[in-house]
């Protein structure tokens, strides 16, 4: 199966202090009931070290978590990823009553899974060309080994384990009986689902526009590559290889749709794998580093509009 930002929340860091999941006030004997995740709940897994606690206020769904997954992962560090999974100290405040904003806004981290592991579809890897182009590399491609595991996830230098695609281990731990599986919440408060049958299709396809760029290079401590991209055809290696075609599939430019009259997002087996933009109101995060370029963030969102 091929799989493979501006938080929608107020994001703060706090210190928080192994799979039992339950309602905080009225403990459940069934740890996998989806309805639990709409209320206050906790996940503590002694085997994997997961500690995630969710409470509801009048305004927010507040999650404090160490962001350790409650399922098996790949071996880290590995050849493509030199980082070790470590506990984080995070608090998310996600809008409890989400509202659509009327526009689509690009977002680096579109949401967080039920277990406290964040979703982050794009990577920090890029090819830089002497002619000025910058191509951001997709997580799911065959040019570079980024060390993704069986859960379509790997680890950042901070030790943060994060999903780039379908969170396979999380879904298996939920043991879902229905096709539509609730896997998390977007930063604007709308839920994130996965369809086991793949009935909701994305609306992206490869661009027909040839690339530009001479003497393009990628460098990190472990890999160095040189490419001449001028007049090459998009093949999915780079974010800018893909374009949104309205009506091509079932989902919109943010990989969302209306489900039973309410807006939701989907993680999917096909590109873009998860939301790269959000439709709801959320507090934007100041993104560090150089500004987006070469048809990435700003231009892509203009296309969405």
Question: Where do the model's predicted regions map?
Answer:
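Solvent-exposed N-terminal domain segments of exported/luminal and surface proteins
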Residues: 22-145, 149-151
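A short, polar beta-strand/turn micro-motif
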Residues: 63-106, 121, 160, 165-201, ...
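A surface/extracellular/periplasmic glyco- and lipid-processing/surface-interacting theme
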Residues: 136-151, 157-159, 172, 182, ...
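Extended, compositionally biased non-globular segments
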Residues: 188-190, 195-292, 302-304
């Amino acid at each position: 199966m091929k799989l493979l930002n501006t938080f929608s929340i107020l994001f703060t860091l706090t210190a928080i202090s192994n799979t039992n999941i339950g309602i905080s006030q009225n403990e459940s004997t069934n740890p996998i009931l989806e309805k639990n995740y709409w209320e206050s709940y906790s996940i503590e897994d002694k085997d994997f070290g997961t500690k995630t606690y969710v409470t509801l206020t009048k305004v927010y769904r507040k999650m404090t978590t160490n962001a350790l997954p409650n399922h098996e992962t790949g071996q880290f560090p590995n050849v493509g990823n030199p980082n070790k999974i470590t506990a984080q100290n995070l608090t998310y405040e996600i809008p409890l009553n989400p509202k659509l904003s009327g526009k689509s806004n690009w977002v680096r981290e579109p949401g967080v899974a039920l277990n406290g592991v964040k979703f982050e579809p794009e990577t920090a890897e890029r090819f830089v060309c002497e002619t000025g182009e910058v191509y951001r590399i997709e997580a799911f491609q065959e040019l570079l080994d980024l060390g993704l595991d069986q859960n379509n996830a790997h680890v950042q230098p901070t030790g943060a384990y994060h999903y780039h695609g379908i969170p396979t281990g999380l879904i298996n731990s939920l043991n879902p009986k229905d096709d539509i599986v609730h896997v998390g919440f977007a930063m604007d408060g709308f839920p994130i689902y996965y369809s086991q049958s793949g009935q909701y299709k994305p609306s992206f396809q490869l661009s027909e526009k040839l690339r530009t760029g001479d003497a393009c290079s990628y460098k990190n401590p472990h890999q160095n590559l040189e490419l001449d991209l001028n007049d090459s055809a998009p093949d999915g290696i780079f974010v800018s290889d893909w374009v949104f075609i309205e009506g091509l599939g079932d989902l919109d430019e943010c990989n969302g749709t209306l489900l039973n009259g309410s807006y939701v997002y989907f993680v999917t087996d096909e590109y873009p794998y998860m939301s790269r933009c959000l439709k709801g109101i959320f507090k934007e995060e100041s993104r560090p580093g150089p500004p987006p370029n070469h048809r990435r963030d700003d231009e892509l969102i203009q296309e969405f509009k």
